[in-house]
Amino acid sequence: MISSLRGMNDILSEDYERFTHFITVATKIAQRYGFHFIETPLLEETALFKRSVGESSDIVGKEMYQFVDKGENDVCLRPEGTAGVVRAFVQKKLDRAGGIHRFFYHGAMFRYERPQKGRLRQFHQFGVESFGESSVYEDASMIMMASDILKELGIGYRLQLNSLGCNECMPPYREKLINFVTKHKDEICEDCTRRVETNPIRVLDCKNEKCQSIYTEAPKLLNCLCSTCESDFTTLKMILKQNEIDFEIDTNLVRGLDYYSKTAFEFVSDNIGSQSAIAGGGRYDRLVEFLDGRPTPAVGFAMGIERLMELIIMPEAKKDGYYLGAMDDEALDMIVKIAQKKRKSDIVILEYKTKNLKNHLKAADKSNAKYCAVIGSNEIKDGTIWVKNLEDKTEKTILSELF
């Protein structure tokens, strides 16, 4: 038997209902905030992610599905969504058009990770990206949108905030952090030893418990912010408080991608094990320029759909549509034509096996149809259809031409 690849799951039945429910809710709320849908290719040039996500990141260094295609192009399956949206933004010259551009997307991403609960090799993200607005009020709007989505889905969360500073306040902080980590060079893991050389701030994202305990004493970036970054972060906290969105400060929150600056945030859940992050994002004002566009302020977030599917509280399923069945072969020939007509306005589940009425009712109930409609010899003779409402249990016989 051929099975799906490890870490790449099928989505069907109840999972599909949860998946589509999430997409419906998230799309509705993103559109309320004035965002428009964008779709980018699954396959991109590898250079896109090396320049955006960062060559020092785990994603680029360890996790990408990368290969050389038949045209000798170095390509990879997208590991995240933001870089592709920024590439499209620059390629379509929207960075030169001025104004504010807001997009949302959803689709499959790919990372060669060790599969575990809440972490797959093919997974789906919903994300939003805003270009052209530098105000911290836009950062707050991103957080409020994510909060609205989670609340409508019935998902509880804790919101964690940090500021990663800017080009002015990051260099002196980086020097302080390097000095601190160097003092502990014999205690930290191999990944952190490598990160100190490539991107020191990423050591704070280490999941090694020993490293985490060491970094609790590390210098705090919030204590090194320039006046502008400090003012923006204070304003962000004020906006969230005014809108009754609770948050906690996490000074070690740096996100897993190299392009973030200033605002960084994560929504976490205590109900899905070690992979607790269910949404996250922040500001990335330099990324458009990194990808050869004009300097453009930008902010966004992404949500891991599979992780959220474990937490979604689904609305009670309602019976809907018609189950249509025949009691003999002559009736079976008739119901196909009747079903085709009815499908122009309603859901119709057609049963191709002839059964007695009792068995048709059982099958209709299992199908979650609201109505069971059956034709037998008497109905053929009278030109009628017998219909039962499976919710209120009422029955009626109507002319087939009126069905």
Swiss-Prot record:
InterPro entries: aa-tRNA-synth_II, aa-tRNA-synth_II/BPL/LPL, Anticodon-bd, Anticodon-bd_dom_sf, His-tRNA-ligase, HisRS-like_core, HisRS/HisZ. GO terms for molecular function: ATP binding; histidine-tRNA ligase activity. Disulfide bonds: none annotated. It holds the Pfam family tRNA-synt_His. Signal peptide: none annotated. Keywords: Aminoacyl-tRNA synthetase, ATP-binding, Cytoplasm, Ligase, Nucleotide-binding, Protein biosynthesis. Gene3D superfamilies: Anticodon-binding domain, Bira Bifunctional Protein, Domain 2. Coiled coil: none annotated. One of its GO terms (biological process) is histidyl-tRNA aminoacylation. SUPFAM superfamilies: Class II aaRS ABD-related, Class II aaRS and biotin synthetases. It catalyses: tRNA(His) + L-histidine + ATP = L-histidyl-tRNA(His) + AMP + diphosphate + H(+). It is found in: Cytoplasm. CDD domains: HisRS-like_core (cd00773). Its EC number is 6.1.1.21. One of its GO terms (cellular component) is cytoplasm. Belongs to the class-II aminoacyl-tRNA synthetase family. PANTHER family: HISTIDINE--TRNA LIGASE, MITOCHONDRIAL-RELATED (PTHR43707:SF1), HISTIDYL-TRNA SYNTHETASE (PTHR43707). Homodimer. This is Histidine--tRNA ligase. It comes from Sulfurimonas denitrificans (strain ATCC 33889 / DSM 1251) (Thiomicrospira denitrificans (strain ATCC 33889 / DSM 1251)). The gene is hisS.
